[in-house]
Amino acid sequence: MNIKNKDNLKITIITVCYNSEKTIKTTLGSVANQTFEKIEHLIIDGKSTDKTISIVKEYSHVKKIISEPDKGIYDAMNKGIKIASGDIIGFLNSDDLYINNEVISKVVSEFKKDPLLDACYADLIYVNHVTYHFH
């Protein structure tokens, strides 16, 4: 990755959603509570018919909301990429969350440490109502 000013990095988090009123509060809260300050959180919604957009509007940290029909999750992700202004782009689905408030800080730290780093990923914890699965 060729970033000129690594001391002033901004990260864009793209959340794509459609009729996500049951889960999106947790997602939005996990981004809002991150300790890293330079976050551009974009919501790309597939024209939800439930309360998703009204819930999103309650979160002042969200920088942009697009709500229009799309051709599926990858079309929505590409819409987000086109308008992203961060040095780093990440995705957080509307039914996912960051496990703690340092996740984005740790990601940015890794990009600052390694000038050749182009991408990173984390372990996943799959949760159902009974068990947790680490991958």
Per-range role (PLM):
Residues 1-32:
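N-proximal low-complexity "stem/linker" segments adjacent to membrane-targeting elements
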Residues 45-54, 93:
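A conserved acidic beta->alpha catalytic loop
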Residues 101-134:
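Conserved donor NDP-sugar-binding/catalytic core segment of glycosyltransferases
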Residues 38-47, 66-67:
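Short beta-strand/loop segment that forms part of the nucleotide-sugar
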Residues 71, 96-98, 124-126:
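Acidic metal-phosphate-binding loop of nucleotide-sugar-dependent transferases
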Residues 22-25, 50-58:
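Acidic helix N-cap motif at the loop->helix transition within catalytic regions
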Residues 89:
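Short aromatic/hydrophobic "clamp" motif used to bind/position activated sugar donors
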Residues 67-84:
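Glycine-rich, basic loop-to-helix element that forms the pyrophosphate-binding segment
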